[in-house]
């Protein structure tokens, strides 16, 4: 779903000779509001940056999502970020986009403020595959249930995690081949099982 939004935005920016940029939040808002939600990420911020670089974006705005920012109203978000900071001409969003304090802002809010702040809202329809709407929620379900191949098909790439190798109980010495304990940090944790993976190390 996100990829479709980005693709359409890039095409429009190129056509109108405008800079193409992306706004993202760190940490993920849902994780900020739910401290018990430890494993939710599909991507790390590092991985997200690399993917956006491949799309050749002109700029990336990373907004620190903290208590102060969570209190900003939808109207102030439009005024301070969309208008004052970015001077956006087009906003590409999915139909279920929510923003602002208590997630009150939606498509209607964006549309209502278009003329005053001189921008246009473009709503990207849901991307479907085999009658199923492709979304982050669906991808998380596939990953957490261990259906990595299906998740990769939805992502159109191989799922990747980045983490530190932790010292374990050194059981690899007893089973005849080396092992490593990888910290998944805030990533989705796949179902317990055996998986074939490719590894690169720094």
Predicted stretch roles:
Residues 62, 68, 75-79, 83-202:
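Active-site cores that bind ATP or allylic diphosphates and position pyrophosphate for catalysis
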Residues 1-39, 44:
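N-terminal catalytic cores of NTP/NDP-binding nucleotidyl/phosphoryl-transfer enzymes
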Residues 44-46, 51-58:
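ATP-dependent adenylation/nucleotidyltransferase module used to activate substrates
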Residues 39-48, 72-78:
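Glycine-rich, highly charged phosphate/nucleotide-binding loops
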Residues 6-10, 49, 78-79, 107:
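Generic structural signal for well-ordered alpha-helices
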Residues 23-27, 55, 59-68, 125:
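A conserved beta-strand->alpha-helix junction
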């Amino acid at each position: 779903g996100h990829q479709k939004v980005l693709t359409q935005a890039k095409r429009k920016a190129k056509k109108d000779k405008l800079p193409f940029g992306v706004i993202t939040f760190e940490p993920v808002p849902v994780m900020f509001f739910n401290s018990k939600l430890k494993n939710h990420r599909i991507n790390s911020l590092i991985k997200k940056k690399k993917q956006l670089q491949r799309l050749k974006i002109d700029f990336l705005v990373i907004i620190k999502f903290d208590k102060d920012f969570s209190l900003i109203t939808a109207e102030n978000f439009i005024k301070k970020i969309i208008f004052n900071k970015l001077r956006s001409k087009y906003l590409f969003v999915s139909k279920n986009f929510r923003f602002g304090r208590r997630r009150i802002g939606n498509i209607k809010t964006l549309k209502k403020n278009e003329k005053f702040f001189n921008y246009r809202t473009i709503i990207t329809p849901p991307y479907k595959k085999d009658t199923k709407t492709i979304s982050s929620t669906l991808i998380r379900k596939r990953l957490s249930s261990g259906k990595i191949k299906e998740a990769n098909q939805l992502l159109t790439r191989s799922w990747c995690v980045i983490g530190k190798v932790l010292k374990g109980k050194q059981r690899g010495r007893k089973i005849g081949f080396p092992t490593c304990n990888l910290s998944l940090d805030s990533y989705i944790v796949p179902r317990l099982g055996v998986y074939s993976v490719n590894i690169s190390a720094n």
